[in-house]
Amino acid sequence: MDIEEKKSLTSSWFRELRDMFCEEFVDIDGGSFERKNWDHKFEGGGEMSLMKGDVFEKVGVNISTVSGKFDNDFKSEVKGTEQAPNYWASGISLVAHMQSPKVPAFHFNTRYIVTGDSVSYTHLTLPTKRIV
């Protein structure tokens, strides 16, 4: 599988995860998500999915797929960008705040980042079964 196939598979997988998470939150709460698209200043963008409900004060399930160039201050911190500062990234972020102050909030995110050095990575394994 070449890097372009991996990027496409990754973006699709994050969209599927977003849809699964949103479905589970709706099943629990009965509310509905509002979606809003946003654009990245270079290329790409994302979609915010927000819900306010009875169980959850606020839930956000956000996905993004963006590309661009790291600035000079940051590119020295990221492997593979010293010679070519280009990047491509896709990810998902989830934040949930409950109505009850006795139930803690939670947050997680994960990203798949491609840099000039990424072509040396040959394995990308994504789950094939529903994990929620």
Please name every model-derived segment.
Residues 122-128:
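Conserved small/polar residues in nucleotide/adenosyl-binding loops
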Residues 2-79:
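Gly/Pro-rich turn-and-neighbor structural signature
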Residues 47-121:
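Internal mixed beta-strand/loop scaffold within catalytic domains of large alpha/beta enzymes
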